[in-house]
């Protein structure tokens, strides 16, 4: 028997990818599955981006790339940070990676020593705590609730800080809740960070353009924490480019250089043609993708309205990303025949078998009372899926 490394045994499988794989398997078996499990836009990559990729092929961008990204790509990203976020990063503070997920692991491996504590507001994206553990760090989860729109308070952050605290890692707008912090809310958190020595923030802003109630705010905009903040972003969500695999960071030079060193031993530079396509994306006026954002907002309103009609569900109004995160704890302890729902994982499996709808348990995101539903699907699919969910939940007694 092959002995796999303990770090792999200690690692949880990505719940979102696992549910997506299960959905594909059932579809292949002929089941009429509606999958609302993955965080992937259902739009096509815009034509102007695909044209940039074709030009890259014709111009023979086919050799090894600089590890941190092409120079003109880093310049384009620095310009994007200035234009969209008011952040003054220089090109040597930019590192381009094979997706924002790689950007995150580069940063965590660069900053976290074994035993360091990393504060992670919960709910959180499933990968955060696993990457922290891979580096030998200790995730410190800060619980939130649907009643306060899943936001942490400055007092809560301050109380969590200790001698081993090294990082706070969070997304804004948030996956899985759709929560979007206001400028004043971030400013209050920034004041706590600024007063804490040798403590940094990784601000995952991959959903920045998919924001409904107000402009998504960057944590690094505040002067007192600019040098303590690493901004993570990418092109996957806003530009429907999940398969192109381009993410990037803006960071203090020392941290950027550490990420370059790590990336040079892992993957080297991100794919050349993907960089040419992503350059066109980051240089584009955000209005180029307004139609997608408007569609997501319309779907958000549709899904929230339909879910509010289901007795027993508790739901807030997400302000960004493309997820809803309803509290389903009122169904715990109920049964349908031989199937008993004890927790959110049970409920997600019940909905898959009874309603043929794939969603993701909130336990994977650090909240055992909720489920994540992605509305990155057509309106017709969403209406049918919520109808199935409603019928299935009504059968629980």
Language-model-derived ranges and their functions:
Residues 64-97:
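Conserved N-terminal alpha-helix of the aminotransferase class I/II PLP-enzyme fold
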């Amino acid at each position: 028997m092959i002995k796999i490394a303990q770090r792999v045994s200690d690692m949880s499988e990505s719940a979102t990818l696992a549910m997506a794989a299960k959905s594909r398997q059932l579809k292949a078996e002929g089941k009429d599955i509606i999958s609302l499990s993955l965080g992937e836009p259902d739009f096509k990559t815009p034509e102007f981006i695909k044209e940039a990729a074709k030009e890259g092929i014709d111009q023979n961008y086919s050799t090894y790339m600089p590890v941190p990204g092409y120079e003109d790509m880093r310049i384009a990203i620095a310009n994007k940070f200035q234009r969209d976020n008011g952040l003054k990063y220089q090109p040597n503070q930019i590192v381009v990676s094979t997706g924002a997920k790689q950007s995150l692991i580069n940063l965590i491996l660069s900053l976290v020593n074994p035993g360091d504590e990393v504060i992670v507001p919960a709910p959180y994206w499933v990968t955060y705590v696993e990457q922290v553990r891979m580096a030998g760090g200790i995730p410190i989860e800060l619980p939130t609730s649907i009643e306060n729109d899943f936001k942490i308070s400055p007092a809560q952050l301050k109380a969590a800080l200790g001698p081993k605290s090294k990082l706070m890692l969070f997304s804004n707008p948030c996956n899985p809740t759709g929560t979007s912090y206001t400028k004043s809310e971030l400013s209050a958190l920034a004041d706590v960070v600024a007063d804490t020595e040798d403590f940094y923030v990784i601000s995952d802003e991959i959903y920045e353009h998919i924001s409904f109630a107000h402009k998504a705010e960057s944590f690094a905009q505040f002067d007192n924490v600019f040098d303590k903040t690493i901004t993570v972003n990418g092109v996957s969500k806003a530009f429907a480019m999940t398969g192109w695999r381009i993410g990037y960071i803006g960071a203090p030079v020392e941290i950027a250089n550490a990420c370059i060193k790590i990336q040079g031993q892992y993957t080297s530079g991100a794919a050349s043609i993907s960089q040419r396509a992503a350059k066109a994306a980051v240089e584009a006026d955000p209005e180029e993708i307004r139609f997608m954002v408007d569609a997501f907002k319309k779907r958000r309103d549709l899904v929230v309205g339909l879910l509010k009609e289901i007795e027993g569900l508790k739901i807030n109004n997400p302000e960004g990303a493309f997820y809803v995160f309803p509290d389903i704890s009122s169904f715990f302890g109920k049964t349908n025949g031989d199937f008993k729902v004890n927790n959110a994982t049970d409920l997600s499996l019940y909905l898959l078998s009874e309603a043929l709808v794939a969603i993701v348990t909130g336990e994977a995101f650090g909240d055992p009372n909720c489920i994540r539903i992605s509305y990155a699907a057509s309106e017709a699919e969403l209406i049918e899926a919520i109808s199935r969910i409603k019928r299935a939940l009504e059968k629980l007694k």
